[in-house]
């Protein structure tokens, strides 16, 4: 059975790189991924970054304008550095422009987000929950009254609503047990980060499924995904070298080459993807790190889309 018949596949836009960003490559990947049958396109948010990176809403709006069917997601937007009111409006706008194709991935963020943006860490989990609740309320209610610890809204109106009902899906990430329980309660999908190991993903999935069951939700109907940084080449040493450069320069973690990424010949890459599917994934985000047009077609063949 082809991999495409077991799980859905997303494709990363080439929006973050140690090399200057290439709009020709972004345009090609967006259109070609849609034509090949990938389900969604994804980006990350990294404004203060030591490598080149586009704003997620801006580049997804561009992708929306040059495609018609493929879904458009960010994994993840760090809510702590944004107003949830602005996030709700931006993503309602993107959902309108794309005719209901937006997927909002959200996260708590890391230490550097709170330091660089001068955001207090105190109460960050409570604030994150309130931000998700405020976004959902603004998307679904004609007038919003919300009294939380961090956000106070009294009869406010955001007239622009998303196309998608009840609202665009909200995905979460991170494999900490508390984060998995939050995802089971608040989210519409979960994606393991590209920097986390494949082994950690395998450990997180059973805990997430148990948390979903505890919330009375069907784990088989809940998107469980993993972003995988990838390099495929008939010469496995070439593939590994490309991925090693990525993890060294972007993540500053060369060990991620083997622990978190997948590299090798087409046969080796397919075998590793099968292993991740066997861990419980029902969606995989493939993230080539170079030669994007060539890698896109190669990966489409590996998973059975061509």
Predicted region positions:
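Alpha-helix-loop-beta-strand connector modules within alpha/beta enzyme cores
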Residues: 50-74, 127-134, 138, 299-306
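Active-site mouth loops of central-metabolism enzymes
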Residues: 11-24, 77-85, 164-175, 230-231, ...
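Conserved, mostly hydrophobic/aromatic
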Residues: 33, 37, 63, 94, ...
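Flexible, glycine-rich active-site loops centered on histidine and acidic residues
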Residues: 2-22, 81-146, 150, 193-194, ...
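Short, acidic/polar
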Residues: 20-33, 86-90, 172-185, 242-243, ...
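Hydrophobic faces of well-ordered beta-strands that scaffold small-molecule active sites
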Residues: 7-13, 41-43, 72-75, 102-106, ...
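N-terminal small/glycine-rich loop or linker at the start of catalytic domains
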Residues: 1-18, 110-115, 147-167, 233-260
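N-terminal beta1-alpha1-beta2 module of alpha/beta enzyme domains
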Residues: 1-66, 168, 289
């Amino acid at each position: 059975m082809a991999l495409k018949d077991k799980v859905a596949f997303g494709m990363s836009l080439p929006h973050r790189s140690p090399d200057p960003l290439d709009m020709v490559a972004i345009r090609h990947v967006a259109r070609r991924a849609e034509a090949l049958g990938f389900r969604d396109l994804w980006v990350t948010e990294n404004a203060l970054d030591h490598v080149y990176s586009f704003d997620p809403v801006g580049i997804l709006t561009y992708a929306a304008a040059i495609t018609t069917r493929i879904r458009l997601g960010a994994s993840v937007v760090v809510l702590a550095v944004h107003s949830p009111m602005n996030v709700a409006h931006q993503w309602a706008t993107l959902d309108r422009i794309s005719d209901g194709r937006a997927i909002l991935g959200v996260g708590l963020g890391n230490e550097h987000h709170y330091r660089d943006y001068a955001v207090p860490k105190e109460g960050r989990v409570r604030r994150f929950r309130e931000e998700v609740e405020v976004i959902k309320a603004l998307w679904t209610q004609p007038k919003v009254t919300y009294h939380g610890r961090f956000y106070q809204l009294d009869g406010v109106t955001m007239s622009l609503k998303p196309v998608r009902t009840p609202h665009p899906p909200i995905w979460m990430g991170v494999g900490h047990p508390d984060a998995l329980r939050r995802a089971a309660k608040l989210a519409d999908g979960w994606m393991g980060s590209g920097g986390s190991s494949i082994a950690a993903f395998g450990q997180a999935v059973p805990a997430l499924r148990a948390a979903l069951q505890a919330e009375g939700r069907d784990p088989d109907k809940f998107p469980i995904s993993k972003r995988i940084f990838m390099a495929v080449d008939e010469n496995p040493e070439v593939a590994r070298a490309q991925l090693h450069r990525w993890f060294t320069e972007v993540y500053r973690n060369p060990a991620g080459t083997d622990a978190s990424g997948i590299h090798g010949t087409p046969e080796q890459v397919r075998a590793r993807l099968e292993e991740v599917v066997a861990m419980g994934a029902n969606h995989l985000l493939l993230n080539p790190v170079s030669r994007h047009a060539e890698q896109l077609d190669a990966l489409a063949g590996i998973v059975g889309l061509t």
